[in-house]
Regions:
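Flexible glycine-rich, low-complexity coil/linker segments exposed to the extracellular/periplasmic environment
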Residues: 152-163, 167
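Alpha-helical scaffold repeats of the Armadillo/HEAT/TPR superfamily
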Residues: 133-146
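Alpha-helical solenoid scaffolds in large eukaryotic transport, assembly, and signaling factors
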Residues: 1-135, 165-173
Length: 173
């Protein structure tokens, strides 16, 4: 995402569309143009959507798709958090816009798949939030412990306290 954000978003939205059982393709301009998203979705939904779409299909080639897709979404958001990409509003706004748009579709494959992917996304983002909270709590405890041990004349202790405070500021952003 950091090198080619438009292409990464296009691949991500295309992945969801493929999970719906649709073979339509999107350009990066279509994915990022949120004002005309409804028209693009109508075009996508006019494509032939397979009856047993991959996320619910129990046939042999599709049997593991649901679990694999859930793991991929969780890994994607974990990696995005580590790379500090979650602060990019364009990523989350575009992702949310497509999921919301697809989740209100009249076609069950789109509606169901987008809703499930949205739930996976919420779960993955919640897990990332929990990790940040745990890191923040550890940093606060370290800062408080350092503050108790610090004497006003000790330069090395002040340096450690400043380092811990800096670490907390990083976690806050």
């Amino acid at each position: 995402y950091q090198g080619e954000p438009a292409e990464a978003l296009t691949q991500l939205v295309t992945f969801v569309i493929r999970l719906c059982g649709c073979t339509a393709t999107l350009s990066s301009d279509e994915v990022r143009d949120l004002e005309h998203r409804d028209a693009v979705q109508e075009r996508i939904q006019s494509h032939d959507v397979r009856a047993p779409y991959p996320i619910v299909s129990r046939t042999k080639p599709w049997s593991g798709v649901r679990k694999s897709a859930a793991r991929l979404i969780a890994k994607l958001w974990a990696d995005a958090s580590e790379a500090e990409v979650l602060a990019d509003d364009d990523l989350l706004d575009t992702w949310q816009s497509w999921l919301v748009g697809l989740s209100v579709s009249s076609i069950r494959a789109f509606r169901h798949t987008a809703s499930v992917v949205a739930l996976w996304t919420i779960g993955a983002l919640s897990a990332q939030l929990e990790q940040v909270r745990e890191s923040y709590d550890v940093a606060v405890k370290q800062r408080d412990a350092e503050a108790r041990r610090t004497s006003s004349s000790s330069i090395s202790n002040r340096t450690r306290l400043a380092h811990t405070a800096h670490k907390m500021e990083q976690l806050d952003t």
